[in-house]
Regions:
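Histidine-centered, metal-coordinating catalytic motifs and their short helical/loop contexts
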Residues: 79-104
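Amphipathic alpha-helical interface segments
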Residues: 1-81, 111-178
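Short, surface-exposed loop/helix-turn segments at secondary-structure junctions
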Residues: 103-113
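Surface-exposed beta-strand edges and their flanking turn/coil or helix-capping segments
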Residues: 98, 107, 166-168
Length: 178
C-alpha cells in the first residue's frame, strides 16, 4: 500500500539529520580530542549526509518523487539553499575523480619526502577543497564546485536548514496523526 510512503523517506531524512547534528556537535565541541584522520572523516561524512538529503528533495533523475515529497511536507527549497547546492553535491559525488587527479599531480612531491613540500601539499588539499574540510575557527565546511572554486558552507546554516526540514516533517506527522 502506497499510503503515506512519504514517511519512509521522512525516516531516512531524519536519520541523516540526526547524524549531521551529532557530527556538527562533535566537530564543534570536541574538536580538541579529534585526531586529524577522524577530523577528515567527519568532514567528508558531513558532506555525504547533506548530499543524501539533497538527493531526496532535489533529484534530477527522480524529479516527480522529489516534487511530491517537497509538496507533501510543505518544504520550500528556498529555505534550504545550502543543502540543495548542486555544485557542492556534484563535486562531492565525484570526489574520487578529484583525488585521482590530485594524487597523480602530487606523487612527485610525496616521493621526495621533503617536509616543506608535504606541508605545501596539505595546504593545496585544503585550499583546493579536495576533501571536505571543516574550518572550525570560522564555523564552516569547505567544498568546491566542478571548476574547483571554493564553496563555503556555514555549519550554522546546515543546522538551521535541517531543523527547518525536521519541523516540516513533524508538522505533517501531527496533521496525519493528531
Amino acid at each position: 500500500m502506497k499510503q503515506y510512503y512519504e514517511f519512509v523517506y521522512a525516516q531516512y531524512i531524519e536519520s541523516q539529520i540526526y547524524y549531521i547534528h551529532k557530527l556538527i556537535s562533535r566537530l564543534t565541541f570536541q574538536r580538541a580530542q579529534i585526531d586529524p584522520e577522524q577530523y577528515f572523516l567527519d568532514s567528508q561524512l558531513l558532506l555525504n549526509l547533506i548530499t543524501n538529503i539533497a538527493n531526496v528533495f532535489d533529484s534530477r533523475r527522480k524529479k516527480g518523487r522529489s516534487e511530491h515529497l517537497v509538496n507533501f511536507f510543505n518544504i520550500s527549497l528556498y529555505k534550504i539553499p545550502t543543502i540543495i547546492n548542486r555544485d557542492m553535491r556534484n563535486t562531492n559525488e565525484h570526489y574520487d575523480e578529484r583525488m585521482d587527479d590530485f594524487m597523480e599531480e602530487s606523487s612527485v612531491v610525496l616521493s621526495r619526502k621533503d617536509i616543506d613540500d608535504v606541508r605545501k601539499l596539505i595546504s593545496v588539499i585544503q585550499t583546493r577543497g579536495l576533501t571536505g574540510y571543516a574550518d572550525l575557527d570560522n564555523n564552516c565546511l569547505y567544498s568546491v564546485d566542478r571548476n574547483l572554486n571554493r564553496i563555503v558552507i556555514k555549519l550554522s546554516d546546515i543546522k538551521a536548514e535541517t531543523n527547518y526540514i525536521m519541523n516540516q516533517i513533524n508538522i505533517k506527522r501531527h496533521v496525519i496523526n493528531p
